[in-house]
């Protein structure tokens, strides 16, 4: 359905819901809800359509501004919908979930925050009880789209967000609830859930995990297999709590245990991959200034509620959380005491063999417009954390089948937009975490991996503003995709060229100009020899030992582009790689290449390529498999960078990043896609992925400029201005004066 269709349907839902709730009380078993809105501004975009209500849903909005974008249209109500409270300055209800059949009133949506936006919660299909109230006592809260529960015997859980601004774009729609989902509290600065134990069968609710100590780490709570009585509660009212491994509940006859973590730090290292959920999805924490969850994943069938994760909320006492499969009672409230949180639209998981990854966004502003919709959930979706001022997830990739949980998506940057991450179609392992610690980052459309045996690469962008318009969808990798680096204030990946088959590495594109636009780099199909190198003048460069290429006919030329602006409009979709795509480097402070690849056959020495960097060391570049001549070195003029032998991750400039060991791909012809790096003070790559088949090495793409736009990087026939270099045969080493560079 197009945007217009959605808008029309939303308007219709609003109108019908208003008419039914206000003018058809005879269908209600209880009085309609009181709409008290002492707010400066209130916008009801699309209240839910109650098709058959036994009672009206009371909606309380004592907030300065409230916008109801599109509350869920309840289709059949046996009881009144939940009251929606929003005592905040501004509240936007974009579109609460439309309950289809209600046996009891939906939950009230509380949002005592300055601004709350309910963009468009998922439509619950059958409600036996009211949907959960969404509480957001924060300055601004936007509920873009709460999850549409499909069958409710009781109301969905309330979502509380006492933060300045919180936007729930679309919480996950639970499909069948026997009891209310757990409340999700997240008022703590930091909490680490390493990996709670997977409960297999619950006859009674799992135990709450309380930790009233300064620091508590649950390395691996015991997996209860069959409970005749509730597990013990674990209390943890401490400043720091680490859940090493939350338990994947397999079948719940009773509600999972609540996880309380009133600590200042929260880290979900690896939420448990529940295989079959009899209980609700995980809590979504957003203790950040502003977080937008556009659309959390809709769980399809719940036998019992997920465990509540409590971060210190005002006060909530759940004596014994009800087992939700079919809700006879209301779901738990979701609390999010962050300044602003926007749940734009987390992915609807359709088939999950394990839970999706938690999405962390401790950045000022992050917009998740549309996380990937998992198609089948055997386990609950991952919690989406956003302790940042504002976070918007525009559209993470929809994983279609998960054998393991998706990666957590981190965005600790001021503002991050995930426009449309690639939809992984089959996952044997969890997707990569998306990190964006930059002020503003836009992921327009990362490449959709079609079959993953291992998780996708994390996308890091700690830069002021970065736009990933459309990274290339890798279809089949014989070798790992290139890392995209962008340490510039603003970077746009518009659409890099799709390399189809490389006989030799693509040339690096350097452009030391103030502004450079790559309109459309040539897709190299087969290289007989490398393109010519383009030099940017550097102070002094010393080649201690140039890298031995395997079989080079001639070295590829480096393309330098130290321009202040770079836009990557659309990275190329590599379909089949005989050699890895080139890495895109943004200039880092210092780079050391310790050990170039061993040449197997030398026809002639490789020419040196200089970028005017202070000092560069090549520790160990990837070994090309067949070289006719040595590959040229590619320099980025960054302060200091160590390539020990890293996989190309997508980094945004962070203080220090270590990749110890990416997840093992179960069925991969090639390693997972590389992360994109933005230039950080210091980065150490322990072990880059080995290219599988190289006819020649891929060129690195450097862009050490403040702002760079890759509209579609130029074909290797285009040169950025270099002094002048002509390679009649393998180019001799030419020295540009650089401070000092050692190979």
Curated annotation (Swiss-Prot):
Mark out the compositionally biased spans (Pro residues). 47-61, 70-86
Q: What's the main place this protein lives?
A: secreted
Please list the tissues where expression of this protein has been recorded: Predominantly expressed in the roots.
Q: Where is this region: Disordered?
A: 46-93, 715-743
Q: Where are the sequence repeats?
A: 70-78, 79-94, 95-103, 104-119, 120-128, 129-144, 145-153, 154-169, 170-178, 179-194, 195-203, 204-219, 220-228, 229-244, 245-253, 254-269, 270-278, 279-294, 295-303, 304-319, 320-328, 329-344, 345-353, 354-369, 370-378, 379-394, 395-403, 404-419, 420-428, 429-444, 445-453, 454-469, 470-478, 479-494, 495-503, 504-519, 520-528, 529-544, 545-553, 554-569, 570-578, 579-594, 595-603, 604-619, 620-628, 629-644, 645-660
Give the CC-aspect GO terms. extracellular region; primary cell wall
Q: Where in the cell is it found?
A: Secreted, Primary cell wall
Q: Name one GO molecular function term.
A: structural constituent of cell wall
Note whether Hydrolase occurs among the keywords: no
Region 24 X 16 AA repeats of S-P-P-P-P-[YT]-Y-S-P-S-P-K-V-[DEYH]-Y-K: start-end pairs: 79-660
Q: Kindly name one Pfam family recorded for this protein.
A: Extensin_2
The stretch of residues making up the signal peptide is: 1-22
Q: Which UniProt keywords apply?
A: Cell wall, Cell wall biogenesis/degradation, Glycoprotein, Hydroxylation, Repeat, Secreted, Signal
Q: GO BP, one example?
A: plant-type cell wall organization
**Per the entry, what induces it?**
By wounding and water stress; in response to plant hormones 2,4-D, BAP treatment; in response to L-Pro treatment. Repressed by salt stress.
Residues of the region (23 X 9 AA repeats of S-P-P-P-P-Y-V-Y-[SN]) are 70-628
Domain of life where this protein originates: Eukaryota
Question: Which protein family is it in?
Answer: Belongs to the extensin family.
Q: What does this protein do?
A: Structural component which strengthens the primary cell wall.
What protein name does the entry list? Answer: Extensin-2
GN (gene name): EXT2
């Amino acid at each position: 359905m197009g945007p217009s269709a959605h808008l029309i349907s939303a308007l219709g839902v609003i109108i019908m819901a208003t008419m039914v709730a206000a003018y058809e009380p005879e269908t209600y078993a209880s009085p309609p809800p009181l709409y008290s809105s002492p707010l400066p501004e209130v916008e009801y975009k699309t209240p839910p359509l109650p098709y058959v209500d036994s009672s009206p849903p009371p909606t309380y909005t004592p907030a300065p501004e409230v916008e109801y974008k599109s509350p869920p249209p309840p289709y059949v109500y046996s009881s009144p919908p939940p009251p929606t409270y929003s005592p905040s300055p501004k509240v936007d209800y974009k579109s609460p979930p439309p309950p289809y059949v209600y046996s009891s009133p939906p939950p009230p949506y509380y949002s005592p925050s300055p601004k709350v936006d309910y963009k468009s919660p998922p439509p619950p299909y059958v409600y036996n009880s009211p949907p959960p109230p969404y509480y957001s006592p924060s300055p601004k809260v936007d509920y873009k789209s709460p999850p549409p529960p499909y069958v409710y015997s009781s109301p969905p859980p309330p979502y509380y967000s006492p933060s300045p601004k919180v936007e729930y774009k679309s919480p996950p729609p639970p499909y069948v609830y026997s009891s209310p989902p757990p409340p999700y509290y997240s008022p703590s600065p930091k909490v680490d859930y390493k990996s709670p134990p997977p409960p297999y069968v619950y006859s009674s609710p799992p135990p709450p995990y309380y930790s009233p100590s300064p620091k508590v780490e649950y390395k691996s709570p015991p997996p209860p297999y069959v409970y005749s009585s509730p597990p013990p509660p674990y209390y943890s009212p401490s400043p720091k709590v680490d859940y090493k491994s939350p338990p994947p509940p397999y079948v719940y006859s009773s509600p999972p245990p609540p996880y309380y973590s009133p600590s200042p730090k929260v880290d979900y290292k690896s939420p448990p991959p529940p295989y079959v959920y009899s209980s609700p999805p995980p809590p979504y924490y957003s203790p950040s200034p502003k977080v937008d969850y556009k659309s959390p994943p809709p769980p399809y069938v719940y036998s019992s509620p997920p465990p509540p994760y409590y971060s210190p909320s005002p006060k909530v006492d759940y004596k014994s959380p009800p087992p939700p499969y079919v809700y006879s009672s209301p779901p738990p409230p979701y609390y999010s005491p962050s300044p602003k949180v926007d749940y734009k639209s987390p992915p609807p998981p359709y088939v999950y063999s394990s839970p999706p990854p938690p999405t962390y966004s401790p950045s000022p502003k992050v917009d998740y417009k549309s996380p990937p919709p998992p198609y089948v959930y055997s386990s609950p979706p991952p919690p989406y954390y956003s302790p940042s001022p504002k976070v918007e997830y525009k559209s993470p990739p929809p994983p279609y089948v998960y054998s393991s949980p998706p990666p957590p998506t981190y965005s600790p940057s001021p503002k991050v937009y995930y426009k449309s991450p690639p939809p992984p179609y089959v996952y044997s392992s969890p997707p990569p975490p998306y990190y964006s610690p930059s002020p503003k980052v836009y992921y327009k459309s990362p490449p959709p991996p079609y079959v993953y045996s291992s998780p996708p690469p994390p996308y890091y962008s700690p830069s002021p503003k970065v736009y990933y318009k459309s990274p290339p969808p890798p279809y089949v990798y014989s070798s790992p995709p290139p890392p995209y680096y962008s340490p510039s204030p603003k970077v746009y990946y518009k659409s890099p060229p799709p390399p189809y088959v490389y006989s030799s590495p693509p040339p690096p594109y350097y452009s030391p100009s103030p502004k450079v636009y790559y309109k459309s780099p040539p897709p190299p199909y087969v290289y007989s020899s490398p393109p010519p190198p383009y030099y940017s003048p550097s102070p002094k460069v010393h080649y201690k030992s140039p890298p031995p290429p395997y079989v080079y006919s001639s070295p590829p030329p480096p393309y330098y582009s130290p321009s202040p602006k770079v836009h990557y409009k659309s990275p190329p979709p590599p379909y089949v790689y005989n050699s890895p795509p080139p890495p895109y480097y943004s200039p880092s402070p210092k780079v050391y290449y310790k050990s170039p690849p061993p040449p197997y056959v030398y026809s002639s020495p490789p020419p040196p390529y200089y970028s005017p960097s202070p000092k560069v060391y090549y520790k160990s570049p990837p070994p090309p498999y067949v070289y006719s001549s040595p590959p040229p070195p590619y320099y980025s003029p960054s302060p200091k960078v160590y390539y020990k032998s890293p996989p190309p991750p997508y980094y945004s400039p962070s203080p220090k990043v270590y990749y110890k060991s990416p997840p093992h791909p179960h069925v991969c012809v090639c390693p997972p896609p590389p992360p994109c790096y933005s230039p950080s003070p210091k980065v150490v790559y322990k072990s880059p992925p080995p290219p599988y088949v190289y006819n020649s090495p891929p060129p690195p793409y450097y862009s050490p400029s403040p702002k760079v736009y890759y509209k579609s990087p130029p074909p290797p026939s285009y040169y950025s201005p270099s002094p002048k270099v002509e390679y009649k045969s393998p180019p001799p080493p030419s020295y540009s004066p650089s401070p000092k560079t050692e190979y």
